[in-house]
Amino acid sequence: MRKTRLWGLLWMFFVSELLAATKLTEEKYELKEGQTLDVKCDYMLEKFASSRKAWQIIRDGEMPQTLACTERPSHPVQVGRIILEDYHDHGLLHVRMTNLQVEDSGLYQCVIYQPPKEPHVLFDRIRLVVTKGSSGTPGSSENSTPNVYKTPPTTTKALRPLYTSPTTVTQAPPKSTADVSTPDSEINLTNVTDIIRVPVFNIAILVAGGFLSKSLVFSVLFAVTLRSFVP
């Protein structure tokens, strides 16, 4: 019983991995209302040159629905807002959906239409996402761009008096020299040097003490080693 259960679990795992590997990939298109979806699906000339091609939509829990299909003598086919063009010489199916609406959002695919057989999927599936183009955004962007261009002139006008005024330039040096020549500043400088000298002296004492302690330890060790060699 254990072996059968183990084999069953392994088989289920193998099947799930196989389905995941064979799952078709999707390509996402994000467009706004009124725009046009333009998709080109390649196919093998030798195998599907004379076959019919179709554009399908896939809804959850339903079979793929054919929205438009080419005829055997290939000509541009239009069904509503969907236009299909089959280029036999290049092995290419050109799909266009004009004047997109939010309701057009969904999963689509190009297929080789060969009923009663299952359709052969061409290219990657198309995940179409259509959003509403808000009319307020262009107006807001237009109002914001003049403000951006107005800021540089205001900054340059504010900076020009600072560079051209002679008073600000002549007043700055006397203040700086007077501050440096005051005795208070000299006292502060001596205080700073005193503060710096104290830790240096302490560090010298610590270093000398370290050397003395190391020399004492070395002499003790040397005496012990000599004593050990003496019979």
UniProtKB/Swiss-Prot annotation:
Compartments, as annotated in UniProt: Cell membrane
Region (Disordered): 134-182
GO BP term, example: innate immune response
Membrane topology (UniProt): Single-pass type I membrane protein
Alphabetically ordered keywords of this record: Adaptive immunity, Cell membrane, Disulfide bond, Glycoprotein, Immunity, Immunoglobulin domain, Innate immunity, Membrane, Receptor, Signal, Transmembrane, Transmembrane helix
Stretches of the chain found on the membrane's Cytoplasmic side: 224-231
Keyword Ion transport: no
Keyword Disulfide bond listed: yes
Pfam families listed in its UniProt record: V-set
SUPFAM superfamilies documented for this protein: Immunoglobulin
Chief subcellular location: membrane
Regions of this protein lying in the Extracellular compartment: 21-202
InterPro entries (UniProt xref): Ig-like_dom_sf (IPR036179), Ig-like_fold (IPR013783), Ig_sub (IPR003599), Ig_V-set (IPR013106)
Subunit structure: Monomer. Homomultimer; when activated. Interacts with TYROBP/DAP12. Interacts with TLR4.
Name recorded for this polypeptide: Triggering receptor expressed on myeloid cells 1
Lineage: Eukaryota, Metazoa, Chordata, Craniata, Vertebrata
This protein's encoding gene: TREM1
